[in-house]
Amino acid sequence: STMFLTPNHKYILYNKLHLVPFAEYIPLSGQFPSLNNLNFGQGNFSHGTEYTVFKWKNTKFSNLICYESSIPKIVRKFIQNGANLITIQTNDGWLGKSAGPYQHYDIAKIRAIENRVPVIRSANTGISGLILANGISINEQPVGKTAVFTVSVPIGEAGSFYSQYGDVF
């Protein structure tokens, strides 16, 4: 889950919509309860149902949690609900020393381009940075580097043909 704490000390909660199979839940365990006896070291979480859009001054943003950035329809729905910025918090530690953290970052670039929306990505062990709506990376921090940085985010009119019509081809 993600919590957005407002200046007047109220909070808004977003619960992850798309859980990672075999890591955060066991698929079909509702239909076949004996699957719950499998132990892969997984969690047994419940997914959220709300496409939450947070508001801060003139910016409306939605947050993706880790694996959700690989699901195009989730970002599309956030944009349709009014988000003009996407943030991603992710744990890329499970990818180890592989191409995974780079691929995961590139997936975030694709989400920015296909929805014409800036993306801010914060990774605990992967690549962090700002991705502009055209896919160009700004202040990209490499895998394994600890960093804190401030960056100006150009907020424009989010949305594209894909945001409006989806997978029509």
In which residue ranges do the predicted regions lie?
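Enzyme catalytic cores with a strong preference for nitrogen-chemistry domains
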Residues: S1-F169
